[in-house]
Amino acid sequence: MEKNFKCWPKGIFKNLSYPEVPIYQILRSAATQWPWRNAIIFGGSELTYQELDQLSDRFAAALHSLGVRKGDRVAIHLPNCPQFAIAYFGLLKAGAIFVPVSPLLAEREFVFQLNDSGAETYIGLDLLFSMPQGCLDRTPAKRVILVSLADVYPPLYASAKPLSKQPFPEGVLDFTDLVSQHPPEPPAVQIEPKKDLAHIAYTGGTTGTPKGVMLTHYNVVVNCCQFAYWFGGGDVDYRDGKFGVRYEEGDGPENHPARRGMEVSLIVV
């Protein structure tokens, strides 16, 4: 086998470490190591790793109280915003499967993806709700949860006017209320990373009807580790429930892993 690495570039690892853990363990690790560091900056508002972890715990508890169980599909139809991250990690902690739905989809495509995925829970934006409101009755959606950007960033301006929160339609649940009304106590869900689905993401449909690509927790964690290697400069080092980085092949437990946390600036698109 070693002969295959004869011309291997110097400094490039021959193998990477892929821990068998649920995706949300990445967030839990960051919240433990850098609770005070910003995870997200959005138009001047800041959300730390600890806050993101706790808010997603609350949302997981909220989903569980609404009847969402392991393996259920939850569609997120949102632009970039802090609530997207909270909802994403929260639904995974509840054992549900993430179905990303682009805000750019036309009604026909929107209805197809919700039906094809079997998403019974829909999370959308109040400002973009007119199209979904007229067609959700043609989908499996039983629970409708709306997000308002006014809750996270009141000074946001649209058309030179302050963005204000309007009352939601009858029967629609308020994302902010759900999070605030539940404790940070997610349900105890056993995840088998190599078997349990985490995402059903749809292809672009350039050659036909979009297909739902099924990704396990392990698939997504592996992808994160690969990105961490190429952009962070080291292999993922997972010990004692924490993610770190090792820079040299052969680093053993005696080498303290470098711990780092980064922040993400979100722009609504």
Where are these regions (language model features)?
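Flexible, non-catalytic linker and terminal segments flanking ANL/adenylate-forming cores
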Residues: 1-20
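Conserved AMP-binding/adenylate-forming core of the ANL superfamily
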Residues: 17-19, 28, 36-81, 85-89, ...
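Conserved AMP-binding A3 loop
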Residues: 48-50, 198-225, 234
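Structural core segment of the AMP-binding/adenylate-forming
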Residues: 65-66, 93-180
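Conserved AMP-binding
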Residues: 78-81, 102, 265, 269
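Short hydrophobic alpha-helical segments of the AMP-binding
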Residues: 84-92, 98, 220, 227
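Conserved short alpha-helical elements in the N-terminal third of ANL/AMP-binding
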Residues: 90-94, 231, 239, 257
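Conserved pre-ATP/AMP-binding loop-to-beta segment of ANL
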Residues: 166-173, 180-202, 209, 235-266
